[in-house]
Amino acid sequence: MSKAPLFEKISVKGTLFPIEVSMKRLHLSHPYTCNGQEFSSLPMYDTSGLHGDCRTQVDPHVGLPPLRSSWNFPRTVQLGVAQTQMHYARKGVITPEMEYVAIRENQQLEEWIRSFNRHGKKVEPITPEFVRQEIAAGRAIIPANLKHPELEPMIIGRHFRVKINSNIGNSAMGSSIEEEVEKAVWSCRWGADTVMDLSTGANIHQTREWILRNSPVPIGTVPVYQALEKAGGKAENLTWELYRDTLIEQAEQGVDYFTIHAGILQEHLPYAERRLTGIVSRGGSIMATWCRHHQQENFLYTHFNDICEILKSYDIAVSLGDALRPGSILDANDEAQFGELKVLGELTKQAWQHEVQVMIEGPGHVPLNLIEENMQKELELCYEAPFYTLGPLITDIAAGYDHINSAIGGALLASLGCSMLCYVTPKEHLGLPDRNDVREGVIAHKVAAHGADIARGNPTAWLRDTLMSQARYSFAWEDQFNLSLDPEKTRAVHSQSIAASGYSAPNPDFCTMCGPDFCSMKRTQKMGKGN
């Protein structure tokens, strides 16, 4: 008899719509008991789509099947007509995407969620109605362009799992379309909840098309990068019309959210010029250059209503870019940063008038003692719209290890309410990341996000840790490997360590850190048995 796979792809049917929510199930080596419930397997949140299904071979030239096309909730693009999740949420209508993300967040663990009680805090499973309420209030978003049917919907908001974003994209210095598609798929395999294509080199349109057709997660872009390419690389040659046409081009391809640097105004530039590191946002520096050259207000700000007319037609979310994020800890929480944040709050209200979904981008480089103020200011000035941050990095001297630097700051900020962390790789400040850097960056930020979920009392996160602790205490090595965020690495490290020690058994009841005679857990078990 062939052995069942340890991981298998499963799908959970909806009750309101003909949807099937993709997850994976881990089969454990033996049952574990938690809070009186027995677990012989664990359903797990999965971002890999069909790319993670060993039974399916995805041809990148064909792409993924159009999952959402058969959901019996027809919406077509009509310019100027709101088609957004917020539009339906405010009308009291639950969409297929809302039911999908509710099922996905619960991970088939409703019984466990109801029984979970940590420090007197009771939790209920997430319902489609709760999702609708959070979207209607602007506290959560489901980025899902009508033109991206391959997408498996996900939700970003502080009452849901902390998400992470992976940045990919070519530059003028190298990388091909195939490499960037591979990085996008690779990101999804390791747990990226969204991917941003930040291509600035050749073939931007073609690269994005390939990525979208192969992506089960939302794809974001910074449209001003492509607009700048069309303007010959000169910021002063940008026009509203050129930018508008770029927005529509990317919207038609299926981009799910746009980073738009509409909050940097002429009045902010003197503050930025007094900084140690000035403006470190690429999009921010482009728009600052345009404003200074033309001595005019940022056209993304003056045309923001026009932008929203486009976004609401496709159900594209706006990620209000932090053009003035601090690029050094000395510049953190200064007048430039918080001045822009106030404008982002005003733009949030403006977007909501168009029923456009909004999230707010945040820093940046921020020392640990100033991180909490960032969360407080964002909630206050931006009306609790989801916060999406780059780290923050807590020191300026971690080059080569900035993924760890960022994950430390991100864990703290997410524990305080940040909704999504943008990953940083070991190549940050040094060069264009390759696929191994992408993996390192994703895993580091999955650690941060999961740690924040623990701090926020997420029952599904607590269950995974509890099972890991039980597996560790019982020396169930395969379960330990598979419950970790990177099973391949943990298995390889353990195997190499055992082999180097000369021990013959592959999975002994100790590790090489302590050896057979100094293992504290082994001794404790003997104490419990009366030995």
From Swiss-Prot:
> Which cofactors does this gene product need?
[4Fe-4S] cluster
Provide the alphabetized UniProt keywords. 4Fe-4S, Iron, Iron-sulfur, Lyase, Metal-binding, S-adenosyl-L-methionine, Thiamine biosynthesis, Zinc
Q: Does the keyword Metal-binding apply?
A: yes
| Ligand binding ([4Fe-4S] cluster) | 511, 514, 519
- One GO location term (cellular component): cytosol
Q: Known EC number(s)?
A: 4.1.99.17
> S-adenosyl-L-methionine as a keyword?
yes
Cofactor binding note from Swiss-Prot or TrEMBL: Binds 1 [4Fe-4S] cluster per subunit. The cluster is coordinated with 3 cysteines and an exchangeable S-adenosyl-L-methionine.
Show the catalytic activity.
Answer: 5-amino-1-(5-phospho-beta-D-ribosyl)imidazole + S-adenosyl-L-methionine = 4-amino-2-methyl-5-(phosphooxymethyl)pyrimidine + CO + 5'-deoxyadenosine + formate + L-methionine + 3 H(+)
Q: Where does substrate bind?
A: 167, 196, 225, 261, 281-283, 322-325, 361, 388
Listed pathway(s): Cofactor biosynthesis; thiamine diphosphate biosynthesis
**What NCBIfam families does the annotation carry?**
PRK09284.1, PRK13352.1, thiC
Q: Tell me which HAMAP family the record gives.
A: ThiC (MF_00089)
Q: Which family does it belong to?
A: Belongs to the ThiC family.
- PANTHER family for this protein: PHOSPHOMETHYLPYRIMIDINE SYNTHASE, CHLOROPLASTIC (PTHR30557:SF1), THIAMINE BIOSYNTHESIS PROTEIN THIC (PTHR30557)
Please give the name of this protein.
Answer: Phosphomethylpyrimidine synthase
The coding gene here is thiC
